A protein has these predicted regions:
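A short acidic, Gly/Pro-enriched loop at the edge of an enzyme's catalytic core
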Residues: 118-126
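A short SAM/SAH-binding and catalytic strip from SAM-dependent methyltransferases
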Residues: 125-137
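Short, glycine-/aromatic-enriched active-site segment of Class I SAM-dependent methyltransferases
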Residues: 160-180
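Short alpha-helix
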Residues: 182-197
Length: 266
């Protein structure tokens, strides 16, 4: 599975900002370009506050990408974070950036499928941003999340859910774009958490908010086309443009919705 092309493009962006390969990098600067979810560190600060992540927290992140969320959480709170990412190239770059940011004493990167990840203990928090719907076998991974949490531990997730039906002639393209291996309806989403022993404390429905974000992101990306292609080439631009435009369309046409959810192990 490769949602985004050329994970090395983040290193190109750092060079364009005058930061050489292997040079130290500040989290505050890195966080402006290493976030793969919606609304960047503002979304992470909401999670930190509402899920009450602090210096004594032990956090497991599922689907860590470049490690941007893990670094921000560790930097802002002092928490220890285990960052699990299935894509080897993203994990490799993520762990390198974590070391360059001086956070490798707080963050452990693991290149693994979450379903195969061996739990070595329990966590106060499990967090995930726009990753859970990619993982197959939803009952199994929700059960594993519950197993990973200590008693009264907290799950915080931003995720997609299925909304209006996707036309049959568009289903193949939709699947290729999203890898929606466990995309379920909102009712099914809540029921699955309950069945896994995770009781919902609060939810926030996000489709209008994220729909606006994805549309604005596409427009801004296209406005910067010349500069982006100069750094990364036209093939990378075209691949990202198709993805960004497709996501904006999926929200606008009601094929997907989005939510924030806070749940606690019962």
């Amino acid at each position: 599975m490769e949602l985004y092309p050329r994970p090395e493009r983040l290193l190109v962006e750092l060079r364009a900002r005058g930061i050489a390969d292997n040079a130290p990098v500040l989290v505050e600067m890195l966080s402006k370009i290493d976030q793969l979810h919606y609304h960047g560190t503002a979304a992470l600060d909401i999670a930190i506050e509402r899920a009450e992540i602090g210096s004594a927290s032990r956090v497991l992140e599922i689907g860590s990408g470049w490690g941007g969320c893990a670094r921000w959480i560790a930097h802002r709170t002092g928490a220890s974070v285990t960052a699990v990412e299935v894509q080897a190239d993203y994990d490799r770059i993520g762990r390198s950036l974590t070391a360059r940011a001086g956070l490798d004493d707080r963050i452990m990167h693991v290149n693994a499928d979450f379903l195969d990840f061996q739990l070595a203990g329990t966590y106060t928090h499990v967090v995930s941003w726009l990753a859970l719907f990619h993982i197959p076998d939803r009952p199994r991974y929700l059960g594993k999340i519950a197993d990973a949490l200590e008693p009264t531990g907290v799950l915080w997730a931003e995720d997609l859910y299925a909304s209006d039906p996707v036309p049959n002639n568009e289903r193949a393209a939709f699947n290729a774009r999203l890898f929606p291996n466990s995309l379920v309806t909102l009712d099914e989403y809540s029921a699955g958490l309950h069945q896994a022993g995770l009781e919902i404390v609060g939810t926030e429905d996000m489709p209008q908010y994220w729909g606006h974000f994805t549309a604005t992101r596409t427009a801004a990306f296209r406005a910067d086309r010349a500069a982006f292609e100069h750094r990364h080439g036209s093939a990378t631009f075209e691949a990202l443009d198709r993805f960004y435009d497709g996501m904006a369309s999926d929200f606008a046409r009601g094929f997907v919705g989005g939510l924030r959810v806070l749940a606690r192990k019962g």
